[in-house]
């Protein structure tokens, strides 16, 4: 995954030093884009070992419309713990906006269900969009959405996805985001009778935290390995029926994990 290393190197070498909400400081770039052809393998970073279990469970949690960490904690996933309140609540974050976007008249819009139906019935639509950035709810969220809008595109029997990410922690967050949206694209493709096409990752503020520079240098010194292959249970026909056991990763060889502090 040279695309990811190129992003990291660009921020490391040319990024502007900026302050940030956490007080840590960053090296920041703006407006970068990466493309991944999903026929070439599953884009899981190989220059450090990633916890795929967390990525899959978080995505299933989003799709379920959940905003409480109970499900995640029950499955050994702690990535949202730092933002949750004492009851595990996060406010109207991703899952709520994806599945229950509130309307002025008190109704709710299931963006994900509508998206799947539109891909099936009107694949040339230019409105195959899901947004998590609900301005009215942002102040009620434990953490406003970083990956805030994505759009699907159907061409020649293939489904592609473009994500706009307003804020991107290059070292810790971006590898998760790449894998999560690549997997979502594969899942939606399966349930709509399409083949996976490309995942396109477009960034607003992409940054390396200043306390991640040493770790970034270590990762940049490593050579990427061959991408693994993700197998999805072909019997699953609804996006809402997937479980953790429906995914099998084959051939994942990665360099050792590199630890780094999370900026909260």
From Swiss-Prot:
DUMP binds at residues 21, 126-127, 166-169, 177, 207-209. The keyword RNA-binding does not apply. It holds the Pfam family Thymidylat_synt. Keywords: Cytoplasm, Methyltransferase, Nucleotide biosynthesis, Transferase. (6R)-5,10-methylene-5,6,7,8-tetrahydrofolate binds at residues 51, 169, 263. InterPro entries: Thymidate_synth/dCMP_Mease, Thymidate_synth/dCMP_Mease_dom, Thymidate_synth/dCMP_Mease_sf, Thymidylate_synthase, Thymidylate_synthase_AS. It is found in: Cytoplasm. PROSITE patterns: THYMIDYLATE_SYNTHASE. GO terms for cellular component: cytosol. It catalyses: dUMP + (6R)-5,10-methylene-5,6,7,8-tetrahydrofolate = 7,8-dihydrofolate + dTMP. Transmembrane segments: none annotated. GO terms for molecular function: thymidylate synthase activity. It is an enzyme of class 2 (transferase). Its main location: cytoplasm. Pathway: Pyrimidine metabolism; dTTP biosynthesis. The keyword Protein transport does not apply. Disulfide bonds: none annotated. Its EC number is 2.1.1.45. Belongs to the thymidylate synthase family. Bacterial-type ThyA subfamily. Catalyzes the reductive methylation of 2'-deoxyuridine-5'-monophosphate (dUMP) to 2'-deoxythymidine-5'-monophosphate (dTMP) while utilizing 5,10-methylenetetrahydrofolate (mTHF) as the methyl donor and reductant in the reaction, yielding dihydrofolate (DHF) as a by-product. This enzymatic reaction provides an intracellular de novo source of dTMP, an essential precursor for DNA biosynthesis. Homodimer. This is Thymidylate synthase. It comes from Parvibaculum lavamentivorans (strain DS-1 / DSM 13023 / NCIMB 13966). The gene is thyA.
């Amino acid at each position: 995954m040279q695309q990811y290393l190129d992003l990291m190197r660009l921020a490391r070498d040319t990024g502007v030093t900026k302050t940030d909400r956490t007080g840590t400081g960053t090296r920041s770039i703006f407006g970068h884009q990466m493309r991944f052809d999903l026929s070439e393998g599953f884009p899981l970073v190989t220059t450090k070992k990633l916890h795929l279990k967390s990525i899959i469970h978080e995505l299933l949690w989003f799709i379920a419309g959940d905003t409480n960490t109970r499900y995640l904690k029950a499955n050994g996933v702690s990535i949202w713990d730092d933002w949750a309140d004492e009851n595990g609540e996060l406010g109207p974050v991703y899952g709520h906006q994806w599945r229950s976007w509130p309307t002025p008249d008190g109704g709710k819009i299931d963006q994900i269900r509508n998206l799947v139906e539109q891909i099936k019935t009107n694949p040339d639509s230019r409105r195959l969009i899901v947004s998590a950035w609900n301005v009215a709810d942002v102040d009620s969220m434990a953490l406003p959405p970083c990956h805030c809008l994505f759009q699907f595109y159907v061409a020649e029997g293939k489904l592609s996805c473009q994500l706009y990410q307003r804020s991107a922690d290059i070292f810790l967050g971006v590898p998760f985001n790449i894998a999560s949206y690549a997997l979502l694209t594969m899942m939606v493709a399966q349930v709509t009778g399409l083949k996976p096409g490309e995942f396109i990752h477009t960034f607003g503020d992409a940054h390396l935290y200043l306390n991640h520079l040493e770790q970034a240098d270590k990762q940049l010194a490593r050579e990427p390995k061959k991408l693994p292959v993700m197998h999805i249970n072909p019997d699953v026909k609804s996006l809402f029926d997937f479980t953790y056991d429906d995914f099998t990763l084959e051939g994942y060889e990665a360099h050792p994990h590199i630890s780094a502090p999370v900026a909260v």
